[in-house]
């Protein structure tokens, strides 16, 4: 049984931890608001760009003028996975959910005899995936020193992916991230970047007829690389919002658990103190009677 001094020290230690978790919750809540606004602002642009890309791709079709980023290599042998997670922890299962989603996909591809390569964006995903797939990781993007995610960060990743594709390093590229829904809901998501899927053309009204200058294929050649960077940018923003939401929820739970632990330790402390006082009183009374 711990002594009164030990219990007192433990109570003080838990109270200090509770102050830290409460402060971290408040910081995460403040950052969440800004991150959520940024993620929600990026969604319409990325969705609209994907829609425009789809319409132009439908016009081009699969003829010889279509860019390779849209048509692909014609093979499905080598897959590149871009896995986006957070640089830091203390956000519940946020990072492990994304990494688990990517890991299951890797296992599935390997079981089919495919070659897999991984680019890790964020330290936590790298730490998780390298335990099983260290030999498959070809690059790691470090964003620890980036205070605010900007388009230039996503653009560098996008250029790296396109460079690898142009060099014949892979056939299919899939982006993994967590789509932010709410503070308590972040959904691990996989999105194919290359080949850029034409999808279904989005109707622009009854007379949606366009002429493309210089031509649709040339526009696609410029648009697809930008779309890749835009989709990565959106994924990074969604991740930041999801990370802050998960961190706020985790720190709220930690603060509440610390409060419950303090109550239990305080109750135990008071019981032991009461028992010690009672014992001392009995000893005093017994000594007085002996006299």
From Swiss-Prot:
It comes from the Bacteria. It is a peripheral membrane protein. Keywords: ATP synthesis, Cell inner membrane, Cell membrane, CF(1), Hydrogen ion transport, Ion transport, Membrane, Transport. It is found in: Cell inner membrane. Disulfide bonds: none annotated. SUPFAM superfamilies: ATP synthase (F1-ATPase), gamma subunit (SSF52943). One of its GO terms (biological process) is proton motive force-driven plasma membrane ATP synthesis. Gene3D superfamilies: 3.40.1380.10, ATP synthase, gamma subunit, helix hairpin domain. GO terms for cellular component: plasma membrane; proton-transporting ATP synthase complex. InterPro entries: ATP_synth_F1_ATPase_gsu (IPR035968), ATP_synth_F1_gsu (IPR000131), ATP_synth_F1_gsu_CS (IPR023632). GO terms for molecular function: ATP binding; proton-transporting ATP synthase activity, rotational mechanism. Belongs to the ATPase gamma chain family. F-type ATPases have 2 components, CF(1) - the catalytic core - and CF(0) - the membrane proton channel. CF(1) has five subunits: alpha(3), beta(3), gamma(1), delta(1), epsilon(1). CF(0) has three main subunits: a, b and c. Produces ATP from ADP in the presence of a proton gradient across the membrane. The gamma chain is believed to be important in regulating ATPase activity and the flow of protons through the CF(0) complex. This is ATP synthase gamma chain.
């Amino acid at each position: 049984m711990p002594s009164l001094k030990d219990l007192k020290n433990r109570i003080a230690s838990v109270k200090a931890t509770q102050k830290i978790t409460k402060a971290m919750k408040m910081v995460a809540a403040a950052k969440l608001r800004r991150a959520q606004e940024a993620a929600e602002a990026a969604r319409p642009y990325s969705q609209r760009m994907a829609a425009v890309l789809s319409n132009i791709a439908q016009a081009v079709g699969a003829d010889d003028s279509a860019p390779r980023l849209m048509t692909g290599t014609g093979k499905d042998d080598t897959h590149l996975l871009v896995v986006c997670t957070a640089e830091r922890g203390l956000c519940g299962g946020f990072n492990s959910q994304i990494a688990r989603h990517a890991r299951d996909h890797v296992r599935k591809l390997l079981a089919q005899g495919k070659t897999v390569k991984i680019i890790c964006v964020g330290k936590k995903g790298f730490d998780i995936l390298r335990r099983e797939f260290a030999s498959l990781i070809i690059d790691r993007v470090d964003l620890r020193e980036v205070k605010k995610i900007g388009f230039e960060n996503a653009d560098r990743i996008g250029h790296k992916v396109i460079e690898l594709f142009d060099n014949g390093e892979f056939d299919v590229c899939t982006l993994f991230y967590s789509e932010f829904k709410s503070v308590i809901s972040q959904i691990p998501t996989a999105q194919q970047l290359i080949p850029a899927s034409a999808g279904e053309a989005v109707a622009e009204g009854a007379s949606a007829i366009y002429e493309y200058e210089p031509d649709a294929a040339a526009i696609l050649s410029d648009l697809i690389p930008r779309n890749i960077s835009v989709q990565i940018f959106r994924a990074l923003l969604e991740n930041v919002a999801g990370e802050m939401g998960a961190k706020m929820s985790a720190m709220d739970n930690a603060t509440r658990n610390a409060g419950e632990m303090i109550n239990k330790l305080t109750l135990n402390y008071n019981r032991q103190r009461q028992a010690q006082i009672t014992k001392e009183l009995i000893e005093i009374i017994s000594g007085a009677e002996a006299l």
